[in-house]
Design a protein with these regions (language model features):
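Extracytoplasmic/secreted envelope proteins and their assembly/folding machinery
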Residues: 58, 74-82, 94-102, 120, ...
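Scaffold signal of the M16-like zinc-metallopeptidase fold and its non-catalytic homologs
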Residues: 138, 166-215, 275, 279, ...
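M16/MPP (pitrilysin/insulinase) zinc-metallopeptidase core fold and M16-derived inactive scaffolds
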Residues: 58-126, 172, 187-192, 303-314
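Acidic/histidine-enriched alpha-helical segments
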Residues: 97-100, 148-168, 227, 246-259, ...
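M16/insulysin-pitrilysin zinc metalloprotease superfamily fold
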Residues: 87-91, 125-159, 312
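Extracytoplasmic
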Residues: 28-33, 39-42, 52-62, 72-77, ...
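Gram-negative bacterial Sec-dependent N-terminal signal peptides
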Residues: 1-23
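An aromatic/glycine/proline-enriched structural segment found at the starts
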Residues: 188, 219-284
Length: 314
């Protein structure tokens, strides 16, 4: 009887969620949210949040390229480029660059400075509030990353001998369940954590960088208690000089549909056997409202199923 009640509750919640989605007014854009496109194609978005003056200033640069754009001979290039970037001063003097990275992460919610995936590379900076000087330096650094890196045998060797601060998405590309999901997908041969093949050819990395790191394939996002107009002007001044245009479309990452079957996966990552029920949900971060709705509905279903199983076990 209890299980029937929970199933009815889950069904009601799902129907309410669906009905609410249909009947709700369309979301209106936040008037504080500004966006634009520079003449070279770079897209920018700025959100001023004066109502949250103590929040840190979040800066993100997304480049629409990742390991899926690599050929077999280029394996590891997409991971190596941000490693090279993190060892250079990015148009700043050494003291400025050191200060930027010392203050450029949130100690309460730390993020990797760069995350490389199959189809994107994300540069992350979290700056203290009321530090317009640091924001200006951050934009200068990211503009340098976007098209002015120095890639030579010396800079490559220096990067490879330094600590690897670049993370991947998914975080563990060798994890058993993820490897199972990759079956039948082109992603299988394009691991974003793959190291460079030896011997390393810096000229080929430079050519890859110039081909895929083009401003028309980049999006810059700045959020915080900032002067939006001033930041927009600074973006135009700092990033407007970048050159290059994407001539080859980047491959689109896709996974095969998840089959309804039971599988056994062996791994050393857990000490106790684990029973999991997995949904065929998108693996990429949520970027649009339809994906958010699917996530909410799946989350309600998961919660109802958890209640039911917990009740049966107790």
């Amino acid at each position: 009887m209890q299980g029937t009640k929970i199933r009815l509750l889950a069904g009601s919640l799902l129907m309410l969620a669906s009905a609410g989605y249909v009947q709700a007014d369309a979301l209106q854009p936040d008037p504080a949210w500004q966006q634009g496109t520079l003449a070279n194609g770079l897209q920018w978005q700025v959100l001023a949040t004066p109502q949250r003056p103590s929040d840190r200033i979040e800066v993100r640069l997304q480049v629409n390229t990742g390991s899926l754009t690599e050929s077999t001979q280029q394996s590891g290039f997409s991971h190596a480029i941000p490693r090279i970037a993190l060892t250079q001063s990015g148009g700043l003097d050494a003291a400025q660059a050191r200060s930027l990275w010392q203050q450029g992460f949130d100690p309460k919610r730390p993020m990797p400075p760069v995350i490389v995936s199959y189809d994107s590379t994300l540069y992350n900076l979290s700056l203290p509030n009321n530090r317009n000087d640091l924001l200006k330096e951050a934009l200068t650094y990211l503009a340098n990353v976007s098209g002015k890196l120095t890639i030579t045998p010396e800079t490559v060797n220096h990067a490879l001998s330094s600590e690897d601060m670049v993370a991947t998405w998914p975080a563990d590309t060798k994890e058993g369940w993820w490897r199972y999901r990759l079956k039948g997908s082109a992603l299988l041969g394009h691991d974003p954590a793959e190291p460079l093949k030896q011997p390393v050819d810096a000229a080929k990395i430079q050519a890859f960088y110039e081909k895929w790191y083009t401003p028309d394939a980049m999006t810059l996002i700045v959020v915080g208690n900032i002067d939006a107009r001033s930041v927009a002007e600074q973006i135009n001044k700092t990033f407007g000089t970048l050159k290059g245009k994407r001539e080859t479309p980047a491959p689109v990452p896709t996974l095969s549909p998840l089959r309804a079957e039971s599988v056994s996966i062996m791994t050393d990552a857990v000490r106790q056997d684990r029973l999991s029920i997995m949904w065929d949900t998108p693996w990429q971060p949520i970027r649009e409202s339809a994906a958010l709705l699917r996530y909410w509905q799946a989350d309600l279903a998961r919660e109802a199923l958890f209640w039911h199983i917990q009740q049966e076990l107790t």
